[in-house]
A protein has these predicted regions:
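Nucleic-acid nuclease catalytic cores
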Residues: 1-18, 87
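Preference for the N-terminal adenyl/adenosyl cofactor-binding alpha/beta module
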Residues: 3, 32-196
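Short, solvent-exposed coil/turn linker segments
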Residues: 12, 21-27, 107, 182, ...
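Glycine-rich phosphate-binding loops of NTPases
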Residues: 16-42
Length: 196
């Protein structure tokens, strides 16, 4: 909600490119109900967000446990630091493909779906490197070599800046968890992006 003391603009954050709803201050007495969402108590939306957050947490837990088993030294502090960073990156990618940040729904899923399980690790290393590079900083032949990878946008903010995180090898089970359970079967756009 934005106000210039004459008009209120109500922007729907679920549709950031949509036109705002406009409410005149002079009409507030008769149109106040249009601002009811500001004082919603115990709404279905909040309950739904909590339910989605719990489901997302369970999925991340399953993914975390499956990844942890693949590390050579699963108790080492460096391993746990890498695993945490990897999980955040994967959740971001899952969110970004569902929320349209990558430009096309299922883009992350489609990038990995035809990669054999043994090649997922390398594909993620390459993807994370590309996500951290502005288009003008990327290999000028990337689009020729790998158009699917070149199509990913630059993600600012440093989430993908550290290339030294350890990514373990993937198994068929782990690939299935990531692509089927986490990507195909769950809509990450329903979670709050503030977790990033």
């Amino acid at each position: 909600v934005v106000c210039n003391f004459q008009t209120f603009e109500i922007h729907d954050m679920n549709f950031p490119n949509g036109e705002p709803e406009v409410l005149m201050l002079a009409d507030l007495e008769k149109d106040y109900s249009r601002l009811q969402f500001l004082v919603d108590t115990g709404s279905k939306t909040i309950k739904k967000e909590m339910e989605v957050s719990l489901q997302a947490g369970e999925l991340v837990g399953v993914l975390y446990d499956a990844l942890l088993k693949q590390y050579k030294d699963p108790t080492a502090p460096e391993t746990l630091k890498s695993l945490n960073a990897l999980c955040v990156r994967l959740v971001f990618c899952l969110y970004a493909e569902d929320a349209g940040i990558f430009g096309r729904r299922d883009m992350f899923h489609d990038y990995l779906k035809n990669v054999p399980a043994a090649g997922i690790r390398k594909a993620l290393v390459e993807l994370f490197r590309v996500l951290d590079q502005k288009p003008e900083e990327r290999d000028k032949y990337l689009a020729d070599d790998n158009p699917a990878l070149a199509a990913f946008p630059y993600v600012n903010g440093g989430l993908f800046a550290d290339e030294n995180i350890e990514i373990p090898p993937f198994t068929e089970e782990l690939k299935n968890i990531l692509l089927s359970k986490a990507s195909e079967d769950f809509d990450w756009s329903a979670i709050s992006p503030t977790i990033f």
